[in-house]
Amino acid sequence: MAPTLPVVSSYTSSPTSLVTLVIGVTTLVWFLSTLHRAVTSPLRSLPGPLWSHFTHLPLKLAIVRGRRTQYIHALHQRHGAVFRLTPTEVAIADAAAAKQIHKPGGGYDKAAWYAQFVQGNAAGLFDMSDAKMHAARRRLFARAFGKSEIRGRWEWMVREKVELAVRRVGEELRRGEESDLLKWWTFMATDKNEYIHVLESTMIGSGIRSELPLLATLGRLIPHPTLQAMFNANSRLLDYGTRAVASSKAAGTGGQGASIFAQLDPDEQKASAFPLTDLDIRVEAGNFIVAGADTTAVSLTYLTYAVLAHPPLQAQLEAEVARLPPAFADRDCEACPLLTAVVNETLRLYGAAPGSLPRAVPSGGAELGGWWLPEGTTV
């Protein structure tokens, strides 16, 4: 009689047991690979919190809560100018290193983090990591964003919106009411109230999507209006971009208020190695909405706060602008030294969108802040 072989069906006959086995093996492999990375990583000797050797999760949670800047600042106070933030990212608060990282042509391309913001398979200026493509795109927009072009085509509209916002603030104050300056500056910087809701949803949804993509994917599947608005806001921005394409084609290239996209030089478009497609214009239009609305409102709110918090400065500033001619223009304001200084100092102290600008260490590695970092490290 042949010998009886051991029966091993206890794990194969039960689906529950098989799932448990797979989960257990997967967890063990993840744990061992994480431990191996922590022990062998070239970044292991850098200062930093213990968890930075193993996981990104504490940083991701801080970002989702809108506390990234404060969170990293607190860690700098504890660990110094250079420390390991995650298994693959190093935080640096060093002027010389910052200059090296962000100087033009320095070789530090945008980190992979930016790729998560690409819409419709078309990268815009904000999330474009290819340096040559980015430079070509900037050249296409250079004329439209030149100071003389903006003044000639848009100053009248800016003045109308500024005067309307200031008038509304004055009406509230004369009625003895408090005035929400952030609200009015946001209305001033945004064409339609609908845009504001899209901007708010985009900011929240983009943060979650970039740090916790699985949660964002699940959120899009839940048929709740708030979640749908939050996690599909980019699609709505693309819709606005579509309107920009249509209006730019209809408006032509002349006259005040012509679309930024209508001012693109056709010859430059043809000569460019990376000409703009309709999808590119839709994406850039959405980017411009995000970049120019709440940033303007936030900066003006902090400027107003800072001036009111310093009465002597307020008096000097009021005296300076009182000397402007009745029909003053932007050029006249630019010639006011104190006003210019106040604007610049506000932008220095209260950046409209403070946060990291993650870059990847170039091929061959680099020394930053006294530490050698391997290529591909996010800094």
Residue ranges with predicted function:
Residues 295-320:
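Cytochrome P450 catalytic-core helices
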Residues 48, 75, 85, 94, ...:
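Structural signal for hydrophobic/aromatic residues that build the beta-strand cores
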